[in-house]
């Protein structure tokens, strides 16, 4: 997985960011520690967003922290409780398993108040957290913790699991029970017979179309091979076992 946008809902990733020196602007207050951000510049040309160069990082397990703090990826070294205003620390992301809940592309780039302006937002939650724990009215907007690959923060990503990796959003398939489906993500299946999705498609699957046109023999063989054994239910179970979370729909 790279910064160019090869992310899908359902992906399980290991994400990391090298620890970089930063100045503490405010010690832990109401579950957050505020630091002068070492990666972004202030977007003085923005007409809509203003940013002062400071980022408040959630401190999980800090007692009064909001639920959003539990989703925080960034950590400080030394730990937040040992830091005060004016101290120099290091901030980064140790290798952390996350699952992707949503992917949004921005054209034109998002006016966020900082530079470079984000072209991509990937919402993630750490292992053990499910999107249902962060309702739409929360700061996380029902999806998760937002990162912006390609925005200057030197994230690295390792793809650990991609359910239905042989399929692409928009693919149309037929299942072993004779039902036709549209695939828009591992947890987003639409049956063309209008009936509820129920337990999902019955394996093996036959690829019918890709990008609205008849599929190639090679693509059809890849889908058939990847669904020759196992089941949709097993795919969900394996994903939940790895992430310790619930699917996003």
Report each predicted region and the residues it spans.
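N-terminal leader/presequence-like segments
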Residues: 1-2, 7-10, 34-36, 46, ...
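Short coil-to-beta transition motif at edge beta-strands of beta-rich domains
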Residues: 4-17, 80-99, 167-174
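Short, exposed beta-strand/loop patches in secreted or surface proteins that constitute
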Residues: 5-6, 23-27, 48, 81-82, ...
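Short, solvent-exposed secondary-structure boundary/capping segments
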Residues: 7, 30-38, 107-122, 189-194
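Acidic surface patches and DE-rich sequence motifs
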Residues: 15-17, 28, 37, 91, ...
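Glycine-centered tight beta-turn/hairpin loop motif at sheet-sheet or coil-to-beta transitions
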Residues: 17-19, 40, 93-95, 129, ...
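Short beta-strand-centered aromatic/proline hotspots
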Residues: 19-30, 95-112, 179-188
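Intrinsically disordered, low-complexity, charged/polar segments
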Residues: 40-82, 117-168, 192-249
């Amino acid at each position: 997985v790279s910064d160019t946008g090869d992310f899908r809902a359902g992906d399980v990733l290991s994400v990391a960011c090298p620890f970089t020196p930063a100045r503490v602007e405010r010690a832990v207050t109401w579950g957050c520690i505020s630091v002068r951000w070492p990666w972004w510049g202030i977007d003085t040309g923005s007409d809509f967003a203003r940013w002062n160069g400071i980022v408040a990082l959630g401190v999980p397990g800090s007692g009064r922290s909001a639920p959003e703090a539990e989703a925080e990826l960034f950590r400080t070294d030394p730990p937040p409780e040992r830091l005060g205003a004016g101290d120099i620390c290091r901030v980064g992301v140790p290798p952390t398993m996350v699952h992707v809940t949503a992917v949004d592309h921005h054209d034109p780039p998002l006016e966020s108040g900082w530079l470079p302006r984000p072209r991509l937002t990937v919402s993630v939650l750490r292992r053990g957290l499910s999107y249902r724990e962060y309702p739409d009215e929360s700061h996380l907007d029902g999806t998760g913790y937002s990162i912006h690959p390609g925005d200057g923060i030197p994230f690295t990503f390792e793809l650990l699991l991609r359910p239905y990796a042989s399929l692409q959003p928009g693919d149309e398939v037929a299942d072993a029970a004779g039902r036709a489906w549209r695939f828009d993500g591992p947890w987003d299946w639409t049956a063309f017979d209008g009936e509820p999705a129920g337990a999902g498609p019955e394996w093996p699957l036959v690829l019918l179309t890709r990008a609205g046109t008849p599929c190639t023999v090679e693509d059809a063989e890849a889908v058939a091979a990847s669904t020759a054994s196992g089941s949709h239910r097993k795919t969900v179970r394996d994903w939940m076992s790895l992430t310790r979370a619930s699917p996003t729909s």
